[in-house]
Structure formats: C-alpha cells, structure tokens
Amino acid sequence: MYKKRKLAILIALLTGTAAAHGQTDLNSIEARLAALEKRLQDAETRASTAESRAASAEQKVQQLTQQQQQTQATTQQVARRTTQLEEKAERPGGFEFHGYARSGVIMNDSAASTKSGAYMTPAGETGGAIGRLGNQADTYVEMNLEHKQTLDNGATTRFKVMVADGQTTYNDWTASSSDLNVRQAFVELGNLPTFEGPFKGSTLWAGKRFDRDNFDIHWIDSDVVFLAGTGGGIYDVKWNDSLRSNFSLYGRNFGDIADSSNSVQNYIVSMNNFAGPVQMMVSGMRAKDNDDRQDANGNLVKGDAANTGVHALLGLHNESFYGLRDGTSKTALLYGHGLGAEVKGIGSDGALRPGANTWRFASYGTTPLSDRWFIAPAVLAQSSKDRYVDGDSYQWATLNLRLIQEVTQNFALAWEGSYQYMDLQPEGYNDRHAVNGSFYKLTFAPTFKVGSIGDFFSRPEIRFYTSWMDWSKKLDNYANDDALGSNGFKSGGEWSFGMQMETWF
C-alpha cells in the first residue's frame, strides 16, 4: 500500500514538471522567433541601406568615370594645343634685323687728308682690288629688315629689304651728299607643298636683290662674282642628293637712270649648278640697241658697244684649307665675252665691245697656324683684252696675306701685306695712258674684339692702324683724275694712320 502511494506521487510530480517545461519551451521558442524576425528585419534594413550605398557609390563611380573621361579629353586637347604651340614656336619666323657697317678716320704723316681705298690703283678701274686693312676712310652702312614665317602646311615665306648708304665726309650731317638707296626688296616662297620631284623643297623668288650665292674675298673688298638686279627665279632644284640648280632672270639698266629716254636694259639669264663642292655657273645676256644708246644730251654713248654676252664660272668650295689642313678655302675661274666680259659684276658694264674677252682667277683660304696665330692668303688675277677699244689690254694680279696674332681673348695684332702688279694698255680710251708696274702696302693694326679672336669672320672689331704704301713711278702717269700721282700723293712712299670700326650681324 505504501509502495503504491509513493509511485502515484512520483508520476504526478513528473507529469507536472513536463507540463511546466513544455510551457517554458514554447515561450522560449516564441521569443527566439521574435528575436530572429527582428534580426531578419535588421538585416533587410542593413541590406537595403547597403544597396542604397552601393547604388550611390556606383553613381559616384559613373560620375567620376565621366569626369575622368572629360578630363582625359581636355588633357588630350591641351596636349594637342601645346604640341601645336610648341611646333609653332619652333618654326623660324618673325622679324629679323641684320646689318653691316664700317666707319673710320685716316690721315697721312703730316696729319692731313690722304688717298685710300681698295680700288685706288689704276688696276682698280677694271676690278683690281688691294688689301683693305688700314686703307679705308669711308662710312658705309647696310641695314636689312626681314620677315619670315612658316605656315601650317610647311610652306615658308621671306621678305627682305636692304637700305644702304655710303659717305666719304667725316661730318655728322651728310644729307646733301648721301647715297642712301634701297639695294634690295624681294620675296621668297619656299617648301611649297604642291611642288614635287626635283622641285620639292625649292624656293621661288621675285624682286630686287643680290643673288644668294654670290661670294667675295673680304680682305680685299672684292666680290669674286656679283649677280644682282631686279627679276625672279628659283633656288635649289634638286636633281639628286648631290646635284642642285638655280635658275634666274635679272634685269639691269645702262647709263643714266635719271634719263627718262634711256630704255636700254640688259637681261641676264643664269643657270647656277652645284655638285657637292663644285660650282658651275653659266649666264647669257642681251641688251638690245646698246650700241645706239644716247646720253642725256642726245649724244651717242658708244657706237661699238656689245648687245650680247656670255659668262661662265667654275668654282670649288672647300670645307678645309685646300684639302691640306683645317680651315676654309674657295677658288674660282671665270670667263666672259662681249657684255659678259665684266666677269665680277655680271652685266653691269655697258661700254664693253662685242669682241671683249676676260679671264679671272680668284682664291682665298683661312687656317690656324697655331693656338695664337692665324693666316688668310688670297690671290686675285685678271686678263682682259679688246675690252673698250680694239687692241687694248688690262692685265693685273693681286697677292694679299693677312695674319692675326692673338694676345688675349679680346686683343690681337693684325698684319697685312698686299702686292699688285699691273700692265695696262688702254690705247687712249677715256684719256688713260699705258703703264706697268707694282704697288705695295703693309699694315699693322692692333685690334680689339669681344671674342673669337682667331675667327676671321667674327665682328665687331675696333682697329688702330698704321700703313705704308709705295708704287712704281710710272703708275703716276696713268690718268689725271685717279689717286696715284695726284697732288701730294706720288710714288716714293706714303704713310697713313687711323682707326676704324667694322661690324656685321
């Protein structure tokens, strides 16, 4: 009995505990579900927020991408513009100013005026120049204004005008004796994009000018060849890598240009060829009715003057001292017939006869002898026959030697020796008399420069100089209106002193 009661009590206790536990588990599950639902809501909220942020970020990325693309496009535009500006800046263009000038004073050993000039000897009338150092008292100025541009298509343009003046007076006010004139005014068109083949890279020109390929011997103030006038032509027609040609037509006037009735003009057609260092130039000219030309008073100027002529030049332009050592050198042989017998200034002498013949040889070079000594020899010789009168003869030769001794980077001693022999048989033309003989000149010139002492072609220079010259007595009798033999300037030795500036840029 006791055992049955105990079992009943145990069953009752177990049943109540299970019910209590069941109620407790249900409440716990509900709570857990509620918490889980809340967490899901929180997760959905966070996911929604994240999606919003992602959408916003994506929008910002798209905006940044667009901005970057715009920036890149702008950068590319700026780069292209910068490149264009740089290319434009690198193109040669704009205005340029160039010039040449010399001016000085000279006196004899009595502190009086004296004769001077590179063409002061009787041979000077036919181009026989002598050394110019310590032998010039004039003021001569050339001023060149140029405008250049390069177009987008690569074509180039160039305009140049040169104004020049020469004076022999020492006064500061010289308008009444001025020789001021416009010596050049021309236009060039280069690298035209429609030009092909041999004409690609060539240059067209027209106007009044000195030919681009003229060259001279500076120390004796003489052109080897000087082609100038008004006309037109083309430079640098390239047949191959080493052969190029220039073609031109120049016009010149003879006689008094102030005479409105003077219609005689000399037309010069020229072909100038270059094959490496070798130059071959051929020119033909015609001046219709030159033998009927009259002066301002209606008088016949020269009834036997030539109407036509030819001219030729063979030149060699070395980038060394005659192939022997460092330096430079140029050599030329010239021939002219008829109107071409004035071989230096092509087509400039209207008094030449149809049978006139002239040969000319010219050569000069520069080279250093040591670190402080530099030398520049030159030779110029000419033979002309039947020039103005049947049977006349003009023969002369000039040897010139200039030395520079560097003392400091700004001071040098310049030395020059010049010798000329002449045999002139004018046959009475223009009241000239037959003479032969020699002329000598020695010059010593302390010289100041800003640098490049050994460069014969660097300027400016300021020189102080003394010169001695003498000549054969027979040369005093050549003419009554030339320098040699004039009053106070006769053979027997002449001293001169002076100073001079010279510059070009």
UniProtKB/Swiss-Prot annotation:
Recall the GO molecular function terms of this protein's record.
carbohydrate transmembrane transporter activity; porin activity
Q: Which GO terms describe its cellular component?
A: cell outer membrane; pore complex
**InterPro entries for the chain:** G_neg_Bact_CarbUptk_Porin (IPR050286), LamB-type_porin_N_dom (IPR021570), Porin_LamB (IPR003192), Porin_LamB_sf (IPR036998)
Q: Where is the composition biased (Low complexity)?
A: 46-82
Q: Where is this region: Disordered?
A: 44-94
Q: How is it placed in the membrane, per its record?
A: Multi-pass membrane protein
Say yes or no: keyword Secreted present: no
Q: Which GO terms describe its biological process?
A: monoatomic ion transport; polysaccharide transport
Which UniProt keywords are listed? Cell outer membrane, Ion transport, Membrane, Porin, Signal, Sugar transport, Transmembrane, Transmembrane beta strand, Transport
- Transmembrane parts of this sequence: none
**Annotated Basic and acidic residues bias:** 83-93
**Where does the protein principally reside?**
membrane
**Family (UniProt):** Belongs to the porin LamB (TC 1.B.3) family.
> What does the entry note on its domains?
The C-terminus helps to anchor the porin to the outer membrane.
Q: How does it assemble?
A: Homotrimer.
Q: Could you identify this protein by its name?
A: Sucrose porin
Q: What is the lineage of its organism?
A: Bacteria, Pseudomonadati, Pseudomonadota, Gammaproteobacteria, Enterobacterales
